[in-house]
């Protein structure tokens, strides 16, 4: 391959490296174009999460701060950290009088509202999402070369146009765009080696939504190793031992983190309601899986349990074998109510009928184990790309092995991995498998006919556009990987294409279940199909990404 020739810029440096930037990649046009679709969707379907946030507006508007985490008139109690409660309080102050009269700010058991409340809350999501656009524009603008800026633009545009955000925020109803915007601020601060800003933004993010604790181990190790520790040993061993900690840096970072958490939790400590707040944030009395199984290890485990139940019923010769292997109580299998309990995410303990019951302690141990495995290389090599890889694997571990994981939590994996995918073409395989399975797994959140065509068409167009866009800008690997790599790519693409019949089957069940009683009895089957198929895909993506993380050193340097 011939060496690339550079044209000299005004400063005497190669034009590709010249600081006088000539490019302009703006997200403004994308924001304007996407705004039209979001406004059209604003009057369509919304989930119960809409009334959740309406109730939080009412709580923070009508009650003193000391009552926010105690109020329980509605089942939709406030269970996000304080900064999100403050956000709802600020938002409530902008509610117009005609929206107030519509019932937006009334504390009631079940919200009674109409179009004015819907439009106000929909617009609040759209406006708050500006944080994501601004943070990603900063990410693009801070690129050092034209090639880097082009890659950054593809990455940024794929995130602001994410089918996940469209489904979860603008149809289902949540505020993830704003929160992931703060995550991007943290990520770009780390990229620019602004470690204090990195700690500041992540502390704020945790105080907005505690799901990002999934990523905390990677952030902690990165800041500790890159900013607070000095492990460059010299000749004088004794002096190095004394100076292994950069005390000034540690003090500055600790002060920022403590200050943020003090502002967030200080008022609740003062009013002595911290126990109630902690109980709201961490309700450990919930089951292993959510009502709709998130596509992770436990979805597959649950499906195997139900498969073994059917084998036990239909193949009598298998009964003594299953009893000997799994040592379960066969009396439970003849309890019709227990067997027909197709959802496992309701309040209470989770009991499997044949397979051993999974405890919260086991899920914590598995999550911690796989996170620690990802943290070791980060501690030894605290580069930005290694940090992003560790961040991705911490998200994977929490999503795949965590307790009571929601399907929406898969965005915690997608966002950090997206920032890495343009680094090396080998990452495209795990990435494509992840996003295709993850976004399809969100489809059951939107089960109405009016939005069916939108979610299918939007997902398909997004995947086609960014499949080729990322392929065009991605860095080629140093080795082609041989015939085995070709086979693996074909298997990945084949599995992704398998999502087409999966969606077709599920859609046909939706279409004809009102006509056929047998389909009504198999109502949970369509959720199981999506959870299991997408779960296998996401686990495969995790395996492929982990292999590259631990084996391919060239991807993770900052060169």
From Swiss-Prot:
Residues 1-24, 97-122, 174-203, 271-286, 385-394, 448-449, 515-526 are lumenal. Keywords: Endoplasmic reticulum, Glycosyltransferase, Membrane, Transferase, Transmembrane, Transmembrane helix. It comes from the Eukaryota. GO terms for cellular component: endoplasmic reticulum membrane. InterPro entries: Glyco_trans_ALG6/ALG8. Dolichyl pyrophosphate Glc1Man9GlcNAc2 alpha-1,3-glucosyltransferase that operates in the biosynthetic pathway of dolichol-linked oligosaccharides, the glycan precursors employed in protein asparagine (N)-glycosylation. The assembly of dolichol-linked oligosaccharides begins on the cytosolic side of the endoplasmic reticulum membrane and finishes in its lumen. The sequential addition of sugars to dolichol pyrophosphate produces dolichol-linked oligosaccharides containing fourteen sugars, including two GlcNAcs, nine mannoses and three glucoses. This is Dolichyl pyrophosphate Glc1Man9GlcNAc2 alpha-1,3-glucosyltransferase. The chain crosses the membrane at residues 25-45, 76-96, 123-143, 153-173, 204-224, 250-270, 287-309, 364-384, 395-415, 427-447, 450-470, 494-514, 527-547. Pathway: Protein modification; protein glycosylation. It catalyses: an alpha-D-Glc-(1->3)-alpha-D-Man-(1->2)-alpha-D-Man-(1->2)-alpha-D-Man-(1->3)-[alpha-D-Man-(1->2)-alpha-D-Man-(1->3)-[alpha-D-Man-(1->2)-alpha-D-Man-(1->6)]-alpha-D-Man-(1->6)]-beta-D-Man-(1->4)-beta-D-GlcNAc-(1->4)-alpha-D-GlcNAc-diphospho-di-trans,poly-cis-dolichol + a di-trans,poly-cis-dolichyl beta-D-glucosyl phosphate = an alpha-D-Glc-(1->3)-alpha-D-Glc-(1->3)-alpha-D-Man-(1->2)-alpha-D-Man-(1->2)-alpha-D-Man-(1->3)-[alpha-D-Man-(1->2)-alpha-D-Man-(1->3)-[alpha-D-Man-(1->2)-alpha-D-Man-(1->6)]-alpha-D-Man-(1->6)]-beta-D-Man-(1->4)-beta-D-GlcNAc-(1->4)-alpha-D-GlcNAc-diphospho-di-trans,poly-cis-dolichol + a di-trans,poly-cis-dolichyl phosphate + H(+). Residues 46-75, 144-152, 225-249, 310-363, 416-426, 471-493, 548-559 are cytoplasmic. It is a multi-pass membrane protein. It is an enzyme of class 2 (transferase). The keyword Plastid does not apply. One of its GO terms (molecular function) is dolichyl pyrophosphate Glc1Man9GlcNAc2 alpha-1,3-glucosyltransferase activity. Its EC number is 2.4.1.265. Pfam families: Alg6_Alg8 (PF03155). It is found in: Endoplasmic reticulum membrane. GO terms for biological process: dolichol-linked oligosaccharide biosynthetic process; protein N-linked glycosylation. Belongs to the ALG6/ALG8 glucosyltransferase family.
């Amino acid at each position: 391959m011939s060496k690339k020739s550079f044209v000299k810029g005004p400063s005497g440096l190669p034009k590709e490296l010249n600081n006088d930037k000539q490019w302009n990649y703006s997200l403004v046009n994308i924001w304007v174009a996407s705004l039209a679709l979001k406004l059209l969707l604003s009057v369509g379907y919304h989930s119960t999460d809409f009334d959740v946030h309406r109730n939080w507006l009412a709580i923070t508007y009508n009650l003193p701060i000391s009552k926010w985490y105690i109020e329980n008139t509605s089942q939709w109690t406030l269970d996000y950290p304080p900064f999100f409660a403050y956000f709802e309080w600020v938002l409530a102050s902008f509610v117009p009088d005609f929206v107030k009269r519509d019932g937006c700010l009334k504390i009631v058991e079940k919200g009674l509202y109409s179009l004015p409340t819907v439009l106000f809350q929909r617009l609040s999501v759209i406006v708050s999402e500006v944080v994501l656009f601004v943070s990603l524009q900063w990410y693009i603008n801070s690129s050092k070369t034209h090639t880097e800026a082009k890659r950054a633009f593809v990455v940024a545009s794929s995130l602001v146009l994410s089918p996940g955000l469209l489904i979860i925020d603008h149809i289902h109803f949540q505020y993830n765009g704003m929160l992931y915007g703060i995550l991007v601020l943290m990520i770009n601060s780390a990229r620019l080696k602004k470690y204090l800003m990195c700690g500041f933004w992540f502390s704020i993010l945790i105080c907005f939504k505690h799901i990002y604790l999934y990523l905390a181990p990677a952030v902690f190790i990165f800041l500790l190793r890159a900013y607070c520790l000095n492990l460059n040993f010299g000749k004088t061993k004794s002096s190095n031992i004394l100076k292994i900690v950069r005390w000034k840096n540690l003090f500055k970072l600790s002060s920022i983190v403590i200050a943020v958490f003090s502002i967030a939790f200080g008022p609740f400590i003062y009013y002595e309601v911290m126990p109630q707040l902690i109980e709201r944030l961490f309700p450990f009395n919930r089951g292993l899986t959510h009502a709709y199984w998130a596509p992770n290890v436990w979805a597959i485990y649950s499906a195997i349990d139900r498969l073994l139940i059917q084998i036990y019923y239909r193949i009598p010769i298998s009964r003594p074998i299953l009893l000997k292997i799994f040592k379960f109580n066969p009396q439970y299998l003849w309890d019709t109510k227990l067997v027909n309990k197709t959802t496992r995410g309701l309040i209470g303990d989770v009991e499997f009928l044949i397979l051993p019951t999974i405890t919260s302690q086991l899920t914590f141990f598995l999550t911690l184990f796989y996170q620690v495995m990802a943290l070791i290389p980060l501690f030894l090599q605290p580069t930005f790309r290694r940090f992003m890889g560790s961040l991705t694997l911490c998200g994977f571990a929490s999503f795949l092995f965590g307790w009571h994981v929601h399907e929406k939590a898969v965005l915690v994996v997608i966002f950090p991995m997206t920032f890495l995918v343009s680094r090396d073409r080998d990452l495209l395989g795990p990435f494509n498998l992840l996003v295709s399975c993850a976004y399809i797994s969100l489809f059951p959140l939107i089960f109405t006919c009016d939005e069916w065509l939108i979610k299918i068409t939007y997902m398909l167009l997004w995947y086609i556009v960014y499949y080729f866009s990322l392929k065009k800008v991605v860095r080629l690997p140093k080795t082609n990987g041989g015939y085995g790599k070709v086979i693996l790519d074909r298997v990945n693409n084949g599995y992704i294409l398998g999502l087409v019949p999966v969606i077709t089957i599920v859609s046909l069940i939706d279409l004809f279940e009102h006509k056929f009683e047998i389909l009504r009895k198999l109502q949970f089957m369509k959720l199981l199909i999506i959870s299991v198929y997408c779960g296998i895909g996401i686990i495969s993506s995790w395996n492929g990404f982990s292999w590259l993380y631990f084996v391919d050193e060239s991807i993770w340097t900052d060169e």
